Amino acid sequence: MAVDTLSPDWDFDRVDDGSQKIHAEVQLKNYGRFLEEYTSQLRRIEDALDDLIGDVWDFNLDPIALKLLPYEQSSLLELIKTENKVLNKVITVYAALCCEIKKLKYEAETKFYNGLLFYGEGATDSSMVEGDCQIQMGRFVSFLQELSCFVTRCYEVVMNVIHQLAALYISNKIGPKIIETTGVHFQTMYEHLGELLTVLLTLDEIVDNHVTLKDHWTMYKRLLKSVHHNPSKFGIQEEKLKPFEKFLLKLEGQLLDGMIFQACIEQQFDSLNGGISVSKNSTFAEEFAHSIRSIFANVEAKLGEPSEIDQRDKYVGICGLFVLHFQIFRTVDKKFYKSLLDICKKVPAITLTANIIWFPDNFLIHKMPAAAKLLDRKSLQAIKIHRDTFLQQKAQSLNKDVQSYYVFVSSWMMKMESMLSKEQRMDTFAEDLTNRCNVFIQGFLYAYSISTIIKTTMNLYMSMQKPMTKTSVKALCRLIELLKAIEHMFYRRSMVVADSVSHITQHLQHQALSSISVAKKRVISDKKYSEQRLDVLSALVLAENTLNGPSTKQRRLIVSLALSVGTQMKTFKDEELFPLQVVMKKLDLISELRERVQAQCDCCFLYWHRAVFPIYLDDVYENAVDAARLHYMFSALRDCVPAMMHSRHLESHELLLDCYDKEIMDILNEHLLDKLCKEIEKDLRLSVHTHLKLDDRNPFKVGRKDLALFFSLNPIRFFNRFIDIRAYVTHYLDKTFYNLTTVALHDWATYSEMRNLATQRYGLVMTEAHLPSQTLEQGLDVLEIMRNIHIFVSRYLYNLNNQIFIERTSNNKHLNTINIRHIANSIRTHGTGIMNTTVNFTYQFLKKKFYIFSQFMYDEHIKSRLIKDIRFFREIKDQNDHKYPFDRAEKFNRGIRKLGITPEGQSYLDQFRQLISQIGNAMGYIRMIRSGGLHCSSNAIRFVPDLEDIVSFEELVKEEGLAEETLRAARHLDSVLSDHTRNSAEGTEYFKMLVDVFAPEFRRPKNIHLRNFYIIVPPLTLNFVEHSISCKEKLNKKNKLGAAFTDDGFAMGVAYTLKLLDQYQEFDSLHWFQSVREKYIKEIRAVAKQQNVQSTSQDEKLLQTMNLTQKRLEVYLQEFELLYFSLSSARIFFRADKTAAEENQEKKEKEEETKTSNGDGPESTVSADPVVK
């Protein structure tokens, strides 16, 4: 036919025509070779990249979508060209109407169904404020107007289809026929008409089930009434309000009263102006009834069978057509009506769209009450009972169905993989294509069956308001996963499927053309001429021409219409016609394979059943073995997104999407991610603390889940992001461990161990906290001690030699200790500036303590006793070899006790001893701060190679002429290095500072009463020794209250106070410790002598008493010796070898030397207050 359009200049003779064909074949071979080379080149690139791009596509990434559906660029007029002009017109009209119906159906399914269904979604009752309902409806009115126009158009198309069919099927009595229609049945037309009627009744069902829409509509009308009473208040002109109200009434009557379908079938189909008569056209009535029965026969055979494709949807159309037939012709075929209702036993309910379920029996009884009366009530009741039993049986058989489909789908996937991975051989090419075609169709059939089970079961439960068991929910979710698995399978092998589909369609077209060719030859060979035979031949030629091309929807439609004409007069034998019909059905399926699979695997309905999602997640969590199935479920949840984009009641559909996104993520966090985080954390904690035996960890006794499987999952795609379970849990653990470590730094080792365990057990790559580490023992922070120094010095005891503080008493099972490492780590945390601040805080503390010290020394009872003792010592020192008598110290102790005792049994001297110990503890703490600072500095400076010769980085940078930023960085580095070097080399003389700041005040004439201090030291040491022995005895008796083994704070306090008063010489002049030693040695010898005398008499009790006395004396002597050593050590810190006068002399000499070295320059100013500011 195409040759007719060429100009005469391009006519070739037969020789040229043959040469052209040869040349075309050569070019085709060259092109084929080029493509093969190009393919192999691409394959080599893929191999080099080690990433087979084309083999398997990742459903989650989907960077490129491959659309297989061919697009028809020729118009219907161009496609339908035969010599038979009348036939051309008939086929063109019907094809155009069918195309129109398909477009209307597509528009309804994508735009109008979704717009109506999602109305009112995205806003919870709690977030809705008054007036939101009316605002939503206000936005939605324009959508309803569009829907009204759409429905009107549908009415027009239905009317036109009926008129076009009625015009064709007329009896000879009325007038001449356009074409001979005996044996011609345009079944395709009725199927399309059924589809359009299905659209209308679906719209009715959506509106009928939409309570929110009706409620909002009522509220909106009320709002309009209130506006109507006072339009000026709302800034609306009254003349505009009335037409708008009329328009709303029209919309309500047309769309919201459930009359969309009814109004369509109640149209006036007979032309009033004497045109086409429909209701009285008996030929058309018979043809109409025959077509419905034919379609029904095909549908009934396949309904509920494994090979069912779209029979349910056609059944809805048949019901619509039957009601339309009854409405037009007012005749009922009782037998057929009963057959239609009998289907309800096979199919109790049909899902029209999303969550809209349709009951055929209700529809037929409601739309045809006259026919319903002919049936007995029992049979109608039986249908309803059967629906209930169907649901019960389905609930029981769901698990079996899941297992069966698991096996079916798994074996189908294996077939797909093996078949598509095989290289195609040329000798079995046709057989391979047939196999592939069958496997593809089988996959689609499984998808259809699974989809039907899920939708019917879920929607029936919802419609009948019956609760679903958890078992049923889990089974249905498994089916959803299987459904998505089928879609994923097709998608993964998109490249091979795309390649196969084009070959299969060509193969099927070839088979169809062969069948048509045989029939065409049969018609041509028959020499009898008739117009009917000419129509048949023209129809077959049209079918042939149309099949020679891409398998587009329009071409397949034309072939279907052409064969409706071409199969009359027995042009095909029975054994030829059935295979042709099968081939055409396969061609339909394969040509739209991707679209049909997508439609069946579309889980948009899940939005209305998202209440099952928490139960599903709980199941996934409990059965972590199948964790990977989460991908399928999220793929199903993602299917709701395109539909939501058609919502029109909110400002933007993005609001609805955000709301849905948040809801799903909240459920995921609550039912899976947070539970997983807590479980992993708990497992790590219990594993690290197994030594505590917190609970039974035996996996044979206590069931354990392998949660590690969750971390091997690829990130799950949802909306425009990926949910990475591994990253989520890792972040949670990192955050938790970091926060808990900052609260309790001493636990850093435990959390570090937990991090390592998380890596080993779950493969989680954790981040190091990089917090300053501490030693494993618990250590108080410098800042904490500094702020509470008054509590610290009273609760902790100082050990001079080990330079350690030990807690005095604690309710815990262990005592806290503080050593140089703790202090060094704290200084590293807070910086060296904390040292100076600590000294200042200690200075403030000492000021308060020395005030109490001064008050005690000034007390009349104390002062008078001390003056007496000084006078007494001066008088007897020559007689007593310049030694302070031990008896005098004991007498002083006893005398003080007479002054009074506290409720705790302490004398004033005991309290004074505690004061001195606290002062000494404060000084011990200052010493530890200095040592900790040196420790910290030496740790920081240890990587500097030579402390004596540190290069200047600033100079080096200047020499190289580097940038200003680098110079600044070098200057900072030099500064840091010099600070650390100075700190590590010398440190700061804090003791000297604290002596210098208090000494002048202590030595002033107004504080003359403090000069008596040296004489109170002997009784004070005696008090201390008695207290110390008492504490150590408690330690031996395991009495933790008041037990102690060290308290060098006392020695430090005495040494510091003597230094401040410059009384080392005065104290030494007492020769106190020498006096003590002589006294105890003398007593020990006396006891030993007595023991020798008594050993002859056999009095054992007396001997035991003497032994105990000797031990006691030795213990006392040992304690005094220890105190003497501690005091001697402490005195070294305060330079006990020099008096205040000698120190001043030394200071002056240094100053003179400095002046001499500086020349006679201006005197440098010295700070009056040596305490660090």
From Swiss-Prot:
Residues the record lists as Phosphothreonine modifications: T1154
Protein name: WASH complex subunit 4
Function per UniProt: Acts as a component of the WASH core complex that functions as a nucleation-promoting factor (NPF) at the surface of endosomes, where it recruits and activates the Arp2/3 complex to induce actin polymerization, playing a key role in the fission of tubules that serve as transport intermediates during endosome sorting.
Subunit structure: Component of the WASH core complex also described as WASH regulatory complex (SHRC) composed of WASH (WASHC1, WASH2P or WASH3P), WASHC2 (WASHC2A or WASHC2C), WASHC3, WASHC4 and WASHC5. The WASH core complex associates via WASHC2 with the F-actin-capping protein dimer (formed by CAPZA1, CAPZA2 or CAPZA3 and CAPZB) in a transient or substoichiometric manner which was initially described as WASH complex.
Coiled coil: 27-56
Keywords on record: Acetylation, Coiled coil, Endosome, Phosphoprotein, Protein transport, Transport
GO biological process, one term: endolysosomal toll-like receptor signaling pathway
Compartment list: Early endosome
GO cellular component labels: BLOC-1 complex; early endosome membrane; endosome; nucleoplasm; WASH complex
Residues in the signal sequence: none
Region (Disordered): 1141-1173
Chief localization: other
Family: Belongs to the SWIP family.
Region of interest called Sufficient for interaction with WASHC5, as start-end residue ranges on this chain: 705-1173
Domain of life (superkingdom): Eukaryota
Pfam family, any one: WASH-7_mid
UniProt feature, compositional bias: Basic and acidic residues: 1141-1155
Organism: Mus musculus
Positions where N-acetylalanine occurs in the chain: A2
Key word Protein transport present: yes
PTM sites of type Phosphoserine: S7
Keyword flag Protein transport: yes
